[in-house]
From Swiss-Prot:
It comes from Mus musculus (Mouse). The gene is Apba3. Ubiquitous. This is Amyloid-beta A4 precursor protein-binding family A member 3. GO terms for biological process: chemical synaptic transmission; in utero embryonic development; protein transport; regulation of gene expression. Residues 98-115, 155-171 have a biased composition (Low complexity). GO terms for molecular function: enzyme binding; enzyme inhibitor activity.
Length: 571
């Protein structure tokens, strides 16, 4: 094969450098590179000294077509052929011929042949070209960053979708772009979006947000675990009762030895783990979203994790959707801090979810719901249920009493009226079968009793003794009312006073009044634990050791009548 020596700069298009632009030095016309050479009749000629005018290109095309299809073998004369080197074959056999390219390993031999043909035929085109634009140029990024992201000069006029990403019209000029265009990742957000999302640092709690992301550890003593069946979203009072039941199952009675194990509770925004204190082995591992409830009852911490039961067969069972609650009971002086840390982890995880998904909190209802913004009140729940409001017609003999004993609903009640405290056995009220202890009497024969004193209500009942038919407007309520008191901290006062288990005074507008506590009621249970026969000091301890208190009360007069401490006066 014979190679033509490079002419001495004849008039025409400028020379084209075939040296790889990715090297440490880019050869120019004035400084030809000698890294690659071809042996020709005129002596060694570097590739940078070769000029690809029309005649040279035509002869190179003919030489390339005359070569065998397999360019992997060495050149017969022992010296490498420039085209052999240009096609990326070198002196070694390529393992993957499809991956070979022109210096930059971007194009194969077929691409080179097509490119040389295009280059040879380009001068014959009749379209006039600006001489200043005939010289090939390296790809340059656009000067206007807001303009078209595509490359400007040196870019192909061919549509972008008409060639593959692994080749280009001028692969020896295609280098790594000076400014690469990168699409923002999916998780990136604009400053406006980040500003609209809740900041992780704004979540209150005992731990720092960064600490919870990495994980914090609290020391505790593991008492034991038990299982309970529960619905998916029971009422808070039900949750507290379940926590109390789990504690009663696991915790040893007072005076007995309580077996316990030293553990570490690991809390993060992903998981809650129970680790052995000595070996740090994971004893229990729960994803954060499976934690259903955390109750701190004094120094006792109850951690409840949800697990779905097997698929139910009947439609009733599928609608009920029972879950298995794994209740872990711990003893720690930092039980309240542990419960707060888990709650803070939930808040931070939710804030991270909003930020990562670029969700505006105002559009997904991150504000507290109406039900959560109002404190729980047992009376209000019953009053809002229209099925509890009914009218009862009692048939009796003229001159016969109704056979009901009435008491006051208590100061602070949402509906101040008379309450049925007892029913005479065999009397007209009991015979009708529609009345029960705890029902609120709002009217009698159309006359309202709401807001009247107990004496006025009793007088209105006595006036209907002469009638044979009496209609009572009632609201069905259980004899025991549940009040829920929520405080930001245990140091905040409850807002009521207790004497011998009876609420004797109430702070107007306090947490107790908002939760449904009423003066004159006797406390029956505190957080699921009966206090009927409990000493006064112990009752005060139960009321002050937790931030959220669930109290079951009933009118003290009703309690005395039901326990036989007083004799009822039937009307």
């Amino acid at each position: 094969m014979e190679f033509l020596p490079g002419p001495q700069h004849p008039p025409g298009p400028p020379t084209m450098d075939l040296e790889e632009p990715k090297g440490p030095e880019v050869p120019s016309e004035n400084h030809p590179s000698n890294t690659q050479s071809a042996l020709g009749p005129g002596g060694p000629v570097t590739l940078s000294e070769m000029e690809l005018d029309t005649s040279s290109v035509q002869e190179l095309v003919q030489q390339l077509e005359a070569l065998p299809s397999d360019l992997g073998g060495p050149f017969p004369d022992g010296a490498p052929c420039p085209l052999h080197i240009a096609t990326g074959q070198g002196l070694a056999t390529q393992e993957n011929p499809d991956a070979g390219g022109l210096l930059s390993a971007e194009a194969g031999g077929d691409d080179l042949l097509g490119l040389l043909r295009d280059e040879a035929s380009s001068p014959a085109q009749s379209v006039p070209q600006d001489p200043a634009q005939t010289a090939p140029r390296l790809l340059q990024p656009p000067e206007d960053p807001d303009g078209d992201p595509g490359w400007m000069e040196g870019a192909s006029a061919e549509p972008a979708d008409s060639r593959s990403s692994s080749s280009s019209p001028e692969p020896w000029l295609e280098t790594a772009p000076l400014v690469t265009q990168q699409e923002p990742p999916v998780g990136t957000q604009s400053r406006e979006t980040l500003a609209s999302c809740p900041a992780v640092t704004e979540v209150p709690g005992p731990c720092g947000p960064e600490e919870l992301m990495d994980g914090v550890i609290f020391g505790a003593k593991y008492l034991g675990s038990t299982q309970l069946l529960s619905e998916r979203s029971p009422a808070p009072s039900t949750r507290m009762g379940q926590a109390q039941e789990a504690m009663d199952r696991v915790k040893a009675p007072e005076g007995e030895t309580q077996p316990m194990v030293e553990v570490d509770i690991f809390i993060s925004t992903k998981r809650v783990k129970v680790l052995a204190a000595d070996s740090q082995d994971a004893l229990m591992d729960h994803a954060l979203q499976t934690i259903s409830y955390i109750a701190d009852i004094g120094p006792v911490l109850v951690l409840m994790a949800r697990r779905r039961l097997a698929r139910r067969t009947t439609p009733q069972d599928r609608q009920r959707r029972l879950y298995k609650m794994l209740c872990h009971v711990f003893h720690s002086e930092d039980a309240q801090l542990i419960a707060q840390a888990i709650g803070q982890a939930f808040s931070i995880a939710y804030s991270q979810f909003l930020q990562e998904n670029r969700i505006d909190p105002s559009q997904v209802g991150t504000q507290p719901s109406t039900a959560a913004s109002h404190p729980h009140n047992g009376d209000l729940d019953h009053f809002c249920n229209s099925q509890n409001c009914r009218e009862v017609c009692i048939q009796k003999r003229p001159g016969e009493g109704l056979g009901v004993a009435l008491v006051e609903s208590g100061w602070g009640s949402l509906l101040p009226t008379a309450v049925i405290a007892n029913l005479l056995h065999g009397g007209p009220a009991e015979r009708c079968g529609a009345l029960s202890i705890g029902d609120r009497v709002t009217a009698i024969n159309g006359t309202s009793l709401v807001g009247l004193s107990l004496a006025a209500c009793q007088a209105a009942v006595r006036e209907v003794r002469r009638l044979s038919s009496v209609t009572l407007s009632i609201i069905h309520c259980p004899p025991v009312t549940t009040a829920v008191i929520r405080r930001p901290h245990v140091r905040e006062q409850l807002g009521f006073c207790v004497e011998d288990g009876i609420i004797c005074s109430l702070l107007r507008g306090g947490a107790a009044e908002r939760g449904g506590v009423r003066v004159g009621h006797r406390i029956i249970e505190v957080n699921g634990q009966s206090v009927v026969a409990m000493p006064h000091a112990r009752i005060i301890q139960l009321l002050t050791e937790t931030r959220e208190i669930h109290i079951k009360t009933m009118p003290a007069a009703t309690y005395r009548l039901l326990t036989g401490q007083e004799q009822p006066v039937y009307l």
